[in-house]
Amino acid sequence: MSILSPRQQQELNRAIVQYIGKIISDNSENLEHGEKNGVLQHQDLVDKVANLLDVPTSSEDLTTNYLEKKWSTVLRLQRKIMDLTDEVSNLKTIIEAKHANGGSEISKDKINWLPTSVFKTFPTQTHQSVNTVAVHPYLPLIMAGCSDGTLSVWNIANDDPSIPEKSIRAHSRAVNRIRWSNSPVELSVKAGASNKSYIFASCSSDLSIKIWDGNSNSQIRILTGHDHTVSSIAFSPSKPSILYSVSRDKTTKIWDSTNGYCTRTFIGHSDWVRDLDVIAAKQKSLGDFILTCSNDQSVRLSHADSGTGLCLLVGHSHVIESVRFLPMHSNAHIDKYLKENSDRFPSMPPELVSAPIYDDVLGYKYCVSAGRDNIVKLWLMPPAVVRPNAHPLPAATNNSQGWHIADLTGHQSWVKTLQVHPNGRFIFSAGDDKSIRVWDLSTLATGGRVTEVKKLMKHEGFVNDINAAPLSEPKDTTNEDILQDIESRMRCVFVSGGTDNTVRLWS
C-alpha cells in the first residue's frame, strides 16, 4: 500500500515521465540524422511508461524540472531539520545547565552571543586539511592555512562559498598558524607620509615565518632562524610590529616585523613548544608577558623582554596543545569561587585572590590550557615579583607554581585549540572528537564546576583550529563600562577548520 495520497501518486508518476522524456529529448538534440531511429524507440518507451503509470505523456501544466526541484527541496529540508535538531539539543543543554547550577542563565544580548549552527561551509580547493583559521580585523574575509602550504582567502559575502577569493602557495610545507597584527603597523615611511596597514604572519613546518601585506596579500619578508617546525605565532598587543614565535626546537623567539630581525631567543621548555599567548602588562614599562605550552606537559609564564620564567603550571598528563590568558574581566567569575572555597586550596594565601597587583600592575591572573589528556584546565598564576627599573622575578609564593582551579571535562579525544569569548565569561575548546564546546565560567561559583553549555557538531573530521573576529582597537574605558565597550566592538563572527578539508562559518 502506497504512503502517498492518490493526488501525490499522480504527481509523482507525471514527474517521472517528464524526467525520462527530458533526458531523451536532450540526447536527441546531439545525435546525427542516422541515429534518430534509436531515439524514436526510446520515445516509444516513454509512451509505454506513461501508459503503465496511467498518466499523459504531455507535461505542459507541470512545473519544469519538477522531479529535480522536489528532490533538491527535500535535501534542503533535511539539512534544515538537522540544523534545528542541533539547535534544540543546544537549548536543552543550556536549560539543563541552568537547573543544575543554581539558575545561571545566558541572555540573548550581543555581549553573550554564541555560535549555534553552520551558516556557510568553505571547502579547500586543494582538498587539504585545514590547520589554522583567522578572521580579518575589519573586512568580511576568512583566511585558512592548509597542510600543503596553501593560504586560502574567502569573502563571507560571496554567494558561492566553494570558490576562494584568493589562493596563495605560501609555504613548501604545512601552514601551522596564521595571525593578524592587533593594530596597523608602519612598515615604511615614504615622502614623509605614514604607511600604516594591518599585516598578518604565517608560520610553517618548513621552518620559516612569513610576513604579508594585509591589503594585497603579498609577501613582505621571510623570517628565518628556527631549526625545526614553527608551531605558533602571536603579535604583541603593546607593540604592533613585534611578533613572537615558538617551535619544535624548544625556543621562543621575538621578531621585529619591520626589518625581519630576531631580537631575542630564550629556551623555557625541555621539549617541543606547541603554542603561546601574549598579554600586555597593565604597567606599560613591564612590556608583555608570554604563556607557552609544550610536549613536556607544562605551561610556562615568561617575561617577554627578559625571557625570565615567572611561574610554571604542572598538572596535565600528556602533551599540552593550547594555552590562553583570561582577560581581567573574567576574574569576577572565578574570584567568588575561590573566596568561598578557600579550604580546597590550603597552599593559597587568603589575601592573594584580592591582591591589587594583578589589576594594577601585571594585567594577568588566570589562564586555561588544553591537551592530549582530553582536558581543559583552569589555573591561577602567582604574581611575579616586580622591582623598580628592573625586569620582574619569579613568583615568591607556592614555589613559583600556579594553582589548578578546575578541570573542564567532556571531550572524548585530544583538545587541540582554545578561544576566549570577548566577554570573558565563555571558553571555546575544540579537538579530535570533531566537536566545539562552549564552557560557562559563571557556573563555577554557583555549581562548583565549569559547565559545558553548548556542543557544536558539524565537522566530519578533527577540528584543528577555531577563531573569533577580533575586536577593533580598544578605547580608554573604566571597569564599569568595559563590557559595554566590548559589546559595541563585537562582530559575532566565529569560524573553525579541520581535517575534513573545510572551514565552517557559524551563526
From Swiss-Prot:
Cellular component, GO annotation: cytoplasm; microtubule; microtubule associated complex; spindle pole
CDD domains: WD40
Sample GO molecular function, one term: dynein complex binding
Gene3D superfamilies per UniProt: 1.20.960.30, YVTN repeat-like/Quinoprotein amine dehydrogenase
Spans of repeat WD: 125-164, 170-222, 225-265, 268-312, 315-389, 410-449, 474-507
Keywords, ordered alphabetically: Cell cycle, Cell division, Coiled coil, Cytoplasm, Cytoskeleton, Microtubule, Mitosis, Repeat, Transport, WD repeat
Coiled-coil region list: 72-98
GO biological process, one term: establishment of mitotic spindle orientation
Pfam (any one): WD40
SS bonds (residue pairs): none
InterPro entries named among the record's database cross-references: Dynein_regulator_LIS1, G-protein_beta_WD-40_rep, LIS1_N, WD40/YVTN_repeat-like_dom_sf, WD40_repeat_CS, WD40_repeat_dom_sf, WD40_rpt, WD_LIS1/nudF_dynein_reg
Entry's localization field: Cytoplasm, Cytoskeleton; Cytoplasm, Cytoskeleton, Spindle pole
Function, as annotated: Positively regulates the activity of the minus-end directed microtubule motor protein dynein. Plays a central role in positioning the mitotic spindle at the bud neck during cell division. Targets cytoplasmic dynein to microtubule plus ends, thereby promoting dynein-mediated microtubule sliding along the bud cortex and consequently the movement of the mitotic spindle to the bud neck.
Family: Belongs to the WD repeat LIS1/nudF family.
Subunit structure: Self-associates. Interacts with NDL1 and dynein.
HAMAP family, sorted: lis1
Protein name according to UniProt: Nuclear distribution protein PAC1
Name of the encoding gene: PAC1
